[in-house]
Regions:
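ATP-binding Walker
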Residues: 15
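Walker A/P-loop
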Residues: 18
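ATP-dependent small-molecule kinase phosphotransfer cores
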Residues: 38-97, 104-107
Length: 206
């Protein structure tokens, strides 16, 4: 059995990444969402074990000491991280796994797993990003300004380090682009070696 593929999706906060990721998981079979660990509090209808594993700072820092993360980062005073064992369990079963992580975490994963496929979600403009952050009503004005400043000074330029860039100005088009990337990556020759060899045997080859 061929190992599954690791996909990374990153974006400035408010670019629509989480909504696209949820839609992609529903559209594409054998694609598993990687549930990250975080020290932040749940928002809205979020549940532990579904959107995130919500843990306290002491638990998270102990996991760091024990090298249990394939990546982790501190963003706006909260930790976020991907557990190594969760990722390995999925890809060993031949399934693909999708990591919804920030640009710092993505850089760590690329160093440890050079064959990952990375996707950057770009907002259509600064003004649209600001409006989306305000409309979702999850942050106070000060936090929104911090997020916009971070996007403008740091995050938006990280697109250069990604394999694919999707501009999320139309949700349906962005969704179809993400789906197409995953399906195309599954058709790469190296990913299909086992199936190809099985077919060749039916033609009398070895």
């Amino acid at each position: 059995m061929e190992r599954g593929k690791v996909f990374i999706v990153s974006a400035p906060s408010g670019a629509g990444k989480s909504t696209l990721v949820k839609g992609l998981i529903q559209l594409v079979s054998n694609l598993v969402f990687s549930v990250s660990y975080t020290t932040r509090q749940p928002r809205g209808q979020e549940l532990t074990g579904r959107e995130y594993h919500f843990v306290d700072r002491m638990v998270f820092e102990k996991m760091i000491e024990e090298d249990k993360f394939v990546e982790y980062a501190k963003v706006f005073d909260h930790y976020y991280g991907t557990a190594r064992v969760s990722l390995e369990d999925v890809v060993e079963k031949g399934k693909d796994i999708l990591l919804d992580i920030d640009t710092a975490g993505a850089a760590q994963v690329r160093k440890k797993l050079p064959d990952v496929v990375s996707i950057f979600i770009m907002p259509p403009s600064y003004e649209v990003l600001r409006k989306r952050l305000e409309l979702r009503k999850q942050d106070n004005p000060e936090t929104i300004q911090k997020r916009l400043q971070w996007a403008a000074e740091k995050e938006i330029y990280q697109y250069e380090n990604y394999d694919y860039v999707i501009i999320n100005d139309d949700f349906s088009q962005a969704m179809e682009s993400m789906r197409s990337i995953v399906l195309a990556e599954r058709c790469r020759k190296g990913r299909m070696t086992h199936r190809i060899q099985s077919i060749i045997k039916t033609f009398g080859g070895t």
